[in-house]
Design a protein with these regions (language model features):
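Sec-dependent signal peptide recognition
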Residues: 3-11
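C-terminal motif of bacterial Sec signal peptides marking the signal peptidase cleavage site
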Residues: 16-17
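Short, low-complexity, disordered segments immediately C-terminal to signal peptides
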Residues: 22-37
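Short alpha-helical "patches" and their helix-cap loops
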Residues: 29, 109-119, 432-444
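Substrate-binding and catalytic surfaces of secreted/luminal carbohydrate-active proteins
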Residues: 34-60, 70-77, 184-186, 217-224, ...
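N-terminal catalytic cores of secreted or lumenal carbohydrate-active enzymes
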Residues: 59-233, 254, 264
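Residues that line or immediately flank small-molecule/substrate-binding pockets and catalytic motifs
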Residues: 97, 135, 240, 313-314, ...
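Short, conserved phosphate-binding/catalytic loop or strand-edge motifs used
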Residues: 239-245
């Protein structure tokens, strides 16, 4: 019995020792984990603000300092940033230089042209680095055109002379200001009429099977012609809005048709022509059907190998409901090797009295915050510049742009949208990574990126009519801030 008792006591000592060791290990691990988070105490934050009913427009409004974090209460509003949790790398932000933008730009005098360029692309502007353009015409221009004579399937008459008149000079001046961070891509709205089932560049129709190779060759001609002009083409989308029959240039592809055109024609043709490094973006339509397109193309290895990622627009709400940001998150999680790129968005239905209409800007802010938080790497606005009517547009589809020019007076009109976009594009730099950011209330929205220099940019939007006091909690540090009613902030630290 005595020997048995000794064994029991010895076993208890061993168990106690092991338990103590595990508790000590856990405590050590937790301590190490906490200490690994960067402490922002005493670091200074710079805040830039744009707010309705004020003169604040990307204005440096205040500087604050971090202190030690205190447990937030349920009654307090807070933004939580965890710089240790990183996500997608940021490609950039920009907009489209269309024929319409180029027409309007050409009416401005030298001073106003330079002002516009600096506003968008200059060091003191909002830092655009992405440019989208159309492969021949879209609705935003004076009319429809292609780069060949009608019926020329061999593309012997291919020429970009029309683009050299106004579009290319505008693009080149923008590129000179952007420099090495340039991302330039192009999208077709429609093949030439003779290549289509409806023999019309407008009103939808489909690419005829017998012209698939000729159409793939057309992309090659475009890329080579632009690069001969000194414009490095980063990539292209296969078709603008491939499920929309529009009264302007449009062409329909089902998911299977786009997949097969990519894997059997466009992808192999680009590779054969030494252009395999160009980034091909599929879909280029709304968030509603994006998952079907991604599943169909990315689950096919022979098609997927040619696709850099998937592009999308924001117009799915035309049928009712709210933006489908959850679809983007699904793709981000389902296909982590593919990229999400916002390729177009604008406020439709131009009206002069709404040039300073604040909800237009808030639509941009809401989309950009939620798109980035869903895994999007880059964001491309539609026309960077339009005239006093929201055009020119050859089918009268007049819309808003961040900047409008009065072609009669030469005045440049900066809308709230310009400033809201700038809260992202001016401070977040290509190569930044998104970091974990959440809010404790729906009254404010937020996202954050960490630039390569280590600086974090947190963007906060308030769409209510009330000033909001909130805590910005970053790791183990916090600071007390306020945001004006109907306002956007960029916080740099």
């Amino acid at each position: 019995m005595i020997h048995k008792s000794h064994k029991i006591i010895g076993l208890l000592v061993l168990i106690t020792s092991c338990t103590d060791a595990k508790v000590e290990d856990v405590a050590t691990t937790e301590s190490t984990a906490v200490s690994s988070m960067e402490n922002y105490k005493n670091k200074t934050l710079q805040i830039y603000t744009t707010a309705r009913d004020t003169e604040l427009r990307l204005t440096k409004t205040s500087a604050h300092t971090f202190s030690d974090k205190v447990q937030p209460l349920e009654t307090e509003i807070a933004v939580f940033v965890n710089p240790e949790k990183t996500f997608q790398e940021y490609l950039g932000i920009g907009g489209a230089i269309t024929d319409a933008s180029s027409e309007v730009f050409s009416t401005l005098n030298d001073t106003q042209q330079n002002k516009l360029l600096q506003s968008l692309y200059g060091k003191d502007g909002i830092g655009y680095n992405i440019i989208r353009t159309s492969i021949h015409s879209s609705d935003f221009g004076l009319g429809s055109h292609t780069y060949i004579e009608e019926g020329d399937a061999d593309l012997k008459t291919f020429s970009i002379e029309k683009d050299k008149e106004k579009r290319l000079p505008f693009i080149k001046r923008a590129i000179d200001l952007i420099g090495d961070d340039l991302v330039f891509y192009a999208s077709p709205w429609s093949p030439p009429a003779f290549m289509k089932s409806n023999n019309n560049m407008l009103q939808g129709g489909k690419l005829l099977p017998e012209f698939r190779q000729a159409w793939a060759n057309y992309y090659v001609k475009f890329i080579k012609a632009y690069e001969e002009e000194g414009i490095p083409v980063w990539g292209l989308t296969i078709q603008n809005e491939p499920m929309a029959v529009q009264r302007w240039e449009s062409c329909i592809y089902t998911a299977e048709e786009e997949r097969d055109f990519l894997k059997n024609y466009l992808g192999p043709t680009l590779e054969k022509e030494g252009l395999g490094d160009k980034n091909i973006v599929v879909w280029d339509h709304n968030r509603d059907l994006i998952t079907d397109r991604a599943n169909t193309i990315f689950e096919d290895p022979e098609a997927s190998k040619y696709a850099w990622g998937i592009g999308f627009h924001w117009y799915e709400t035309w049928t009712g409901g709210l933006p489908k940001y959850d679809n983007l998150k699904n793709i981000y999680e389902s296909f982590p090797s593919k990229n999400l790129l916002f390729t177009e968005g604008c406020q439709e239905g131009f009206a002069t009295e709404k040039l300073q209409f604040w909800p237009n800007a808030e639509r941009y802010g809401n989309s950009m915050i939620n798109d980035f938080n869903s895994g999007v790497v880059g964001w491309t606005d539609w026309n960077i510049l339009l005239d006093e009517r929201g055009g020119p547009n050859h089918v009268e589809n007049f819309c808003f742009a961040p900047i409008h020019a009065n072609t009669k007076t030469g005045e440049l009109i900066y809308t709230p949208t310009y400033y809201y976009i700038g809260h992202f594009s001016k401070f977040i730099k290509p190569g930044a990574v998104r970091v974990s950011t959440t809010t404790s209330r729906t009254t404010i929205e937020s996202t954050s990126f960490k630039n390569k220099d280590g600086k974090i940019v947190t963007v906060v939007m308030n769409t209510t009519d009330t000033k909001i006091a909130y805590k910005l909690i970053v790791g183990n540090s916090e600071t007390d801030l306020e945001i004006e009613p109907r306002a956007m902030q960029s916080i740099i630290y």
